[in-house]
Amino acid sequence: MPLNVSFATNRNYDLDYDSVQPYFYCDEEENFYQQQQQSELQPPAPSEDIWKKFELLPTPPLSPSRRSGLCSPSYVAVASFSPRGDDGGGGGSFSTADQLEMVTELLGGDMVNQSFICDPDDETFIKNIIIQDCMWSGFSAAAKLVSEKLASYQAARKDSSSPSPARVHGGCSTSSLYLQDLNAAASECIDPSVVFPYPLHDSSSPKPCASPESSAFSPSSDSLLSSNESSPRASPEPLVLHEETPPTTSSDSEEEQEDEEEIDVVSVEKRQPSTKRSGSPSAGGHSKPPHSPLVLKRCHVSTHQHNYAAPPSTRKDYPAAKRAKLDSGRVLKQISNNRRCASPRSSDTEENDKRRTHNVLERQRRNELKRSFFALRDQIPELENNEKAPKVVILKKATAYILAVQAEEQKLVSEKDLLRKRREQLKHKLEQLRNSCA
């Protein structure tokens, strides 16, 4: 049943209705028109009554007021359970001094300070109703909790001594009212650890705070376990949020621990953030992967540039190039053997080295052959000024030119022989003439 309290003085209208507002109007057969006719001249429209009948509490609960006043839910509950006056009316029969004295006695008692305010280990205070169910726990539940505390306090007050009248002083009552308002705010607030119960910088299991300030507003371990089990997203993954690696399952973590012993080329790039933290154990594995893509890029050479039109006899004309090729091949083979002895290489790496060596030697052979063709072209009179002459034309013209030169040589040699014979004849004739004259 809702709590209806009215004060004669110092009434705060902005919080009274919210603090005592019920979930529904309990009496479903209540005649609103008859009540309105008794208080007002004209009844309200039926639509207003319908919406007022089904009016709910605001969800989520409103933030508590931070100002000191007499309209907090705890004080309303205190006033509602206080002894009523002789006239049988509401709380309006009490004066302001009596109300302040009751609140001061409630907050100043030793039992209340130990069990309700200053005892953070109390299970009743830790397991707050608002924290257990923050959606539908209204002020009636908070008033019920205060009433239970008040009943136990009144039972213990009979045995204890009465408080001194000096506590009804104005300054003390103001501070006690402010503490009462803060106490009401603490009971109505929601702990942020319920929304996100996992710590960001603690890799171990979640522990409750050790300080009394934080423990007073933190839920118990049972409530944390129940919230973790009930939530579908609860998993041990968020417990390692401080690490740099992404959250993985237990099977993945076991596989990564086994893979750290044997590091291959494929898995190094996948576990690069973790190997950076490890340091020296994975230093040898990081040197291989950056070089392998570069080797593949450099070894990609098209094979359609070979000179298939050149006759096989041209290689016999250039024994120096072939000798250099064989020598460089031996040197590179020795280098590859030394590397193989120093560190075991895979078959792919060996094939890449062989392909790279072959490409270098083939490029050198083509360059030397091109320079030879250019030199031969310059010796042919017909192709001396033709820079775009193909290699086949150069070879044909060179062959014809060589044959012509050889024929010319034979002709000149025969002519030389004839001239030598003529000379010999002339010499012999000259000798005969000298002998005849003598």
UniProtKB/Swiss-Prot annotation:
Domain bHLH residues, every copy: 353-405
Biased composition (Acidic residues): 252-264
Glycosylation (residues): T59
Motif segment (9aaTAD): 101-109
Modified residues annotated as Phosphothreonine in this record: T9, T59, T314
SMART domains on file: HLH
Compositional bias of kind Polar residues: 334-346
GO CC terms, sorted: cytoplasm; nucleolus; nucleoplasm
Gene Ontology molecular-function annotations: DNA-binding transcription factor activity, RNA polymerase II-specific; E-box binding; protein dimerization activity; protein-containing complex binding
Compositionally biased intervals (Low complexity): 208-238
Record PTM: Phosphorylated by PRKDC. Phosphorylation at Ser-328 by PIM2 leads to the stabilization of MYC. Dephosphorylation at multiple sites by the PNUTS-PP1 complex promotes MYC stability by preventing ubiquitination by the SCF(FBXW7) complex. Ubiquitination is counteracted by USP28 in the nucleoplasm and USP36 in the nucleolus, both interacting with of FBXW7, leading to its deubiquitination and preventing degradation. Also polyubiquitinated by the DCX(TRPC4AP) complex. Ubiquitinated by UBR5 when not forming a heterodimer with another bHLH protein, leading to its degradation: UBR5 recognizes and binds a degron that is only available upon heterodimer dissociation.
Biological processes per GO annotation: chromatin remodeling; chromosome organization; DNA damage response; G1/S transition of mitotic cell cycle; intracellular iron ion homeostasis; MAPK cascade; negative regulation of cell division; negative regulation of monocyte differentiation
Summary of subunit composition and partner proteins: Efficient DNA binding requires dimerization with another bHLH protein. Binds DNA as a heterodimer with MAX. Interacts with TAF1C and SPAG9. Interacts with PARP10. Interacts with KDM5A and KDM5B. Interacts (when phosphorylated at Thr-59 and Ser-63) with FBXW7. Interacts with PIM2. Interacts with RIOX1. The heterodimer MYC:MAX interacts with ABI1; the interaction may enhance MYC:MAX transcriptional activity. Interacts with TRIM6. Interacts with NPM1; the binary complex is recruited to the promoter of MYC target genes and enhances their transcription. Interacts with NUP205.
Function of the protein: Transcription factor that binds DNA in a non-specific manner, yet also specifically recognizes the core sequence 5'-CAC[GA]TG-3'. Activates the transcription of growth-related genes. Binds to the VEGFA promoter, promoting VEGFA production and subsequent sprouting angiogenesis. Regulator of somatic reprogramming, controls self-renewal of embryonic stem cells. Functions with TAF6L to activate target gene expression through RNA polymerase II pause release.
Protein name: Myc proto-oncogene protein
